[in-house]
């Protein structure tokens, strides 16, 4: 499926602020949430609608409302930072959780937690994580949501690189990928360059 880089001056400006080493955890979190919110317009453009009869102050007419449940699936812990921005525009979205960690030596992905929600098989499922680096965590998370029965899945991140994009497309060709930026490369430690650093540490102030 397609890879979409969502380019917009507001997103580019906020992402630049996040990249700076001197940016505080507070500002990092706020900009992350705001970028996630700005990306919602593009990510949800194919959300299903149903017609409804309504009455305005001047006449009766037909309107349209969302007719598809939405489930957000943050990859813990950094994915949590993207929830607030998305939920501001999709307040009825339910939240499932997947906890993964990456072995710093082997770069292999390991699961430590997973909690689904009802009717995920009928829902529009968005897996979120700020970084798409090697693709290990994204692929593992999507493996899990497919085991839960999810069929309509998108992966949303802030920053992605070609190795992660390619791996996700190869393992899950039915999943659309959205990013605010396609960065240059991975370094020898598997970190995105220029990237954001460790997003989880910067969100929670644990660096």
UniProtKB/Swiss-Prot annotation:
Binds 1 Mg(2+) ion per subunit. The magnesium is bound as Mg-PRPP. Allosterically activated by GTP. HAMAP family: Upp_B (MF_01218_B). This is Uracil phosphoribosyltransferase. Keywords: Allosteric enzyme, Glycosyltransferase, GTP-binding, Magnesium, Nucleotide-binding, Transferase. Its cofactor is Mg(2+). Uracil binds at residues 192, 197-199. Pathway: Pyrimidine metabolism; UMP biosynthesis via salvage pathway; UMP from uracil: step 1/1. One of its GO terms (molecular function) is GTP binding.
């Amino acid at each position: 499926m397609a890879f979409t880089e969502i380019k917009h001056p507001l997103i580019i400006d906020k992402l630049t602020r996040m990249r700076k080493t001197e940016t505080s955890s507070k500002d990092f979190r706020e900009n992350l949430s705001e970028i996630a919110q700005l990306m919602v317009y593009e990510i949800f453009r194919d959300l299903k609608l149903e017609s409804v009869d309504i009455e305005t102050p001047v006449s009766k007419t037909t309107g349209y409302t969302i007719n598809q449940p939405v489930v957000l699936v943050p990859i813990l812990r950094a994915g949590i930072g993207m929830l607030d921005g998305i939920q501001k525009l999709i307040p009825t979205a339910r939240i499932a959780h997947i906890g993964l960690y990456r072995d710093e030596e082997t770069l292999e992905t390991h699961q430590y937690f997973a909690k689904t929600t009802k009717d995920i098989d009928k829902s529009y499922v968005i897996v979120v994580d700020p970084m798409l680096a090697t693709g290990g965590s994204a692929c593992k998370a999507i493996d899990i949501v497919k085991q839960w029965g999810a069929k309509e899945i998108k992966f949303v991140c802030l920053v992605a690189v070609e190795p992660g994009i390619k791996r996700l497309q190869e393992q899950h060709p039915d999943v659309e990928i959205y990013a605010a930026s396609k960065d240059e490369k991975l370094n020898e430690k598997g970190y995105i360059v220029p990237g954001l650093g460790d997003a989880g540490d910067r969100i929670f102030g644990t660096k």
